[in-house]
Amino acid sequence: MWFQTLNLTLTKSPVRCFANGNPPREDNEEYAEAEYEDLVKRTFHLSDSGNQVLIVQPYVKWGSGKKRNTTPELQLAEAVALIETLPKWKVVDKLVLPLQSFHKKTFFGKGNLKMLRDKVRENEKIVSVFISVNELRGTQHRELEEQFGVPVFDRYMIVIQIFREHATTMEAKLQVARAEIPYLRSRIRDYQEGALERIGTSTAVIGGDGETFVDVRRKIVGLREKKLKQELEKIRSNRELLRSNRTRLQYATVAVVGYTNAGKTSLIKALTGKTTLQPKDQLFATLDVTVHEGYLPSQLKVLYVDTVGFISDIPTELIEAFNATLEDALLADVIVHVCDMSHPDLSAQCETVTATLRRLDVNKNLLENMIVAGNKIDLPHQLGPDMNLPPDITRVSALHNTGLNALLSRIEKSVLAATGRVSMVVRVPAGGSEMAWLYKEVAVSEVISDSEDSQYVLMRVVISEGQLGRFKRLFIDQ
């Protein structure tokens, strides 16, 4: 007999135990896949039937943990927006709660815990609770679920739900799966402890070679992580090849970053005139890092890199899972940071983006020269507390094309400085080989006849040092 079963009340399906510690070879991958999917489903409480949620926005009243660039009410509004982004999810009730810290075993004090427990029990519409903090500790999560008797979510879990919903391409799905790994790993020990408490023992050997429940789960997660890394490495290699081709062709790249739903895709659509881009008014609408061709006022071709949006109060590991594609943005020549000028929590959102870029080790010079574009100026402004925006912010409306010329001029100036290009006027014979070479190799923004000699033209071009050297060797230093 190849295996026996040990039923743990934490899982609906039995945990299979093998006499030699390993399943039959032909069943190994299938078994690991099924167990991994079961682990993900239970850890993140995945369901196709939707949810009805009580949202609790905790905040620290004073001390070092107090947030000073936002308010609990604005944080709660974002928590509501996160839930409303998910299909079939509804907010049943919501509240803010002041706490001394987020470190208690039960997260809340006795009074607040009882109040919340009673609220959940008395309202049958509440079938889950969302505690809007970046990540609950395993012990806190287990305690709260035992107290409330319903699934409990933190921000990491909710963002993963949204990522799963919005991931459509293979690249995005692989990176979402990679983003799940750190959370799964942090929960495995708690996953075991919860089961062991129910079967009343301190250890559970489920493999013939002495493997415990947690050993098997770690191995399953490790196998999936290894597989994901291999697939993502292929993506990274392909993107490196594309980047090297762009470098060879001397294309300048402009990364467009920002808080989720700040209007990054809308701005790229406005800057490039690409009607095929379809921005969506929702959080994390873009999970794929995509590249779009555009032209600066000098007719220099640039590539705009659209990126996944950032958000506050989630671990950096969640965003780092998208490194395979984020590298396109991190290695750009210029960064444009898009802010939502109409958002009441504008200051906090801008600070979140800058802090996230620092944690992702973006080049210091790139950060210092980052262009800030204040989008959505066509909407009513609701400036929040302690506004601290860059004095040289360029205000635009991607929807109405307001301020785009000023923004394009700033982008052009930064691109020229970052790539060593210069704008200059070159006098060449009209219709000659020099003129043809310049049209083919560099950006030409203007051509006028030479007023002193009609056989010549004056060409305003944007040219790199290398291109200028080649031009001189071909046509001047002969």
Regions found by a protein language model. Name each.
Residues I55-Y59, K94-L97, F130-S132, H337-D340, ...:
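Conserved beta-strand segments of the P-loop GTPase G domain that flank and frequently precede/overlap
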Residues P14-L54, S186-A262, S266-K269, G273, ...:
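C-terminal-of-GTPase-core extension/linker across diverse P-loop GTPases
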